[in-house]
Amino acid sequence: MTDPLEPRKVIGIYHLHKEYEDRVILRDVNLQVGNGEFVFLVGPSGAGKSTLLRMIYMDEAPNEGQVVVGSYVSTNLKRSQIPLLRRRIGIIFQDFKLLDDRNVFENVAIALRVVGARNAEIKKRVIQVLTQVGLYHKRYDRPVTLSGGEQQRVAIARAIINSPEILLADEPTGNLDPEVTTEILQLLLKINSSGTAVLMATHNHELVRNFGQRIVFLREGAIEEDIRLGLAAFTRDRVGIAQPAGRNPEWKRGEKT
């Protein structure tokens, strides 16, 4: 029987295996992320975190296994379906991938233009997300003139422009100072509080220790541990977000899935 308290599954990863030449990158990875979950993907460099995110985004194919996003199954996916699937998945790349020859507005709008949105819809939605990430006043600036934290906010705005069910974040605070790191995580937590699931790859153990709800440890391409923690009330209070309904406010260390 299905647990009525179990969140609806947004993505499912089953027996995923990836090799490059003779090197195994991912080995028999199984992972499910539920609606509204915030999952930290933790592991050393070379553990396979970025590769796993690219495969969920259908930017890279596994040698074995499959990724399921809603009704889309990677092993049965047609090339023409990939743009439709990607409307359900937002991704923040490690190097931002912003276009320096376009202003902030156009960098965010491009994700709507490629799916054929009308100009009026594009303008309305871009204004909404730039306001959400605190960059509306920078809409006509070029990315090269922005700070690292501001560039990351542009990347986040672009990733959420299509109102995705899940947001993939590849080391989104990797090159930012501690104060800006906290600001970016506050923003991601607020996006998550609206119901968007987040799967975030990180090396930052302090973030995981302070904000982790669920932590997946990846080592040498395999999931070593998958731990769920109760979310401490003070953690959410610290970033101005109410405790989610039905969540135990105490830490539950050691519970594994």
Where are each of the predicted segments found?
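Helix-to-loop junction immediately C-terminal to a conserved catalytic motif
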Residues: 57
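Conserved ABC ATPase signature
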Residues: 142-146, 150
